[in-house]
Amino acid sequence: VGNNRGDMPQSETLAHTLRDRLHLMGLKLGCGQGACGCCTVIMDGRAVTSCMVLTMDCDGSSITTIEGLADPETGDLTGLQQAFVDNCGFQCGSCTSGIIMTARALLDEKPCPTEEEVRDALAGNYCRCGTHYTAVESIMAYVEKRRSEE
């Protein structure tokens, strides 16, 4: 994460390192047991729940948080993030960064997934507000926009 290195307690999770030490507040802490997906980041190209990964096991890994998606120069949102804004893909925001990171990992692997594949990928991300369907709609709107631009 931004070439940050340092000594961490052996039992510290990546989620706590990212929030407490690196002050990356886009990542949300939810259940702390890997069940809700709120703390999802992309590690070496895969979506992982950062509350289940020890920081000491991340040496040499590439980690991307929600903060790492936007354009670093302008702060402009990615097309996927903008699709969530345009389609009201979130409500309270607790689950949003985890869902977007899971979707980003899926889209990096499969640029034009079906709705069923999106739903399957998001199976580990829970939305307490009950607006999970708007997240799926936002992702599919992004996929459709990309298809139409090809």
Positions of predicted regions on the chain:
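Signature of N-terminal electron-transfer/Fe-S-associated modules in redox systems
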Residues: 1-150
